[in-house]
Amino acid sequence: MSSLPRNAVARNSKMHKKRDSGVKLSRNINTLDAVCKKHAVGNLIFRNCKMASYEGRVSFVDHEETRGNMRSGVIVVKATSIYSSEDIYDVVKVREDKIARDLKKRQEDYEKTKLEVERLKRSEELANKLANNDPKHDQLVEKLNENNTVEPNNESTEESVEQITEQTVEQTTEQTVEESVEQTTEKTTQQTAEESVEQSTEQTVEKSGDQSTEKTTQQTAEESVEQSTEQPIEESNKNTNQNNDNKKKKKEKNKYYRNFMKDIKSKFSLKLRPENNYFEVKAETTDMIIEHSVVYEIVMVPPTKETYLLVIGDLQMKSSYLRQIDPQYKMDAVLKEQTEFMERIKAKEQLKIHQSPNNKLEPEDMILDDGTSTLTEIEYLGLEEES
């Protein structure tokens, strides 16, 4: 049956199809490599990669190869698998906690101000009530009115009033005479002194003033003109230089990015992944993040097992980005992860030393600084038996 002509034709056509698909795939991979090489998208080394949405859904990326150009803000990731997690992304959690804390603080401040306003209103109402309903105040007002209306009827009171008025008149006349004499003498002395001083000063000022004023006015005018012209010129030059530098950087970045995107769009079809708004990588012990990342999937024809991702955005330090969101954020989780990583490195180094035949150490030497051992319980017991 296999020797029949129709079966041979079918078998050959299948082989040709497989061969054609493999050729097309290798051609597409070669074109992608050529585009990356042309635009200086070089190899990058990251420990892990993950993506997240604004809602906090996390997708972990098992990457086989990463390439990028930080100047263009472009990263190409070859991923063997992408799987999602139920955990909420820590950046989203920090932002939500900050918003909730701010709302709580605003509510507390609003309640405090509300209570203070109510307290002030009550105090004002009490003050108004006391002012309007004070019986002692009314009694005092009535007594004062009665005293103003009462007329003096006794002769003894009239005589005492006349004596008091005579004494007061004599005292006032004596005081006024003395004060008028003192004032007239002071005025005359002041006038004569002022006239003599004015005459003497006018003559000296007219001679020396003309010369000094001309010199000072010329100097001050020249200095003010120089300062006023130099300061705005320097400031304008600084501003123009900064603006030009920023424009050049933006133009260069846009130029490199435009050329890369033009090339890759002409050779591949790109599929947008709108759910991936954050892209995070770990380089050694440093976490880096792209905020508002734009992630495309490079569609390969025929489809491959690997997924090629194109990530667009500027990398920045995750710690500084989190401090921008919440200045009070404490990097406890990051510090914990870094210490665990350093402990693992120390353990690996200790194991390498133990495995070498020349350096045979005692079990006490294989204990780390924090008290944990780098060996398992079985290995530890074996070393004790050998010793």
Swiss-Prot record:
- The record's region (Disordered) falls at 1-23, 146-255
**Which cysteine-cysteine pairs are annotated as disulfide bonds in the entry?**
none
**Which stretches are annotated as coiled coil?**
98-129
Report keywords, A-Z. Coiled coil
| Keyword set includes Coiled coil | yes
Transmembrane domains' residue ranges? none
* Compositionally skewed regions (Basic and acidic residues) per UniProt: 204-213
Please list the residue ranges that the record marks as compositionally biased, kind Low complexity.
Answer: 162-175, 182-194
Q: Where is the composition biased (Polar residues)?
A: 214-231
Q: Does the keyword Membrane apply?
A: no
* Record's protein name: Uncharacterized protein R604
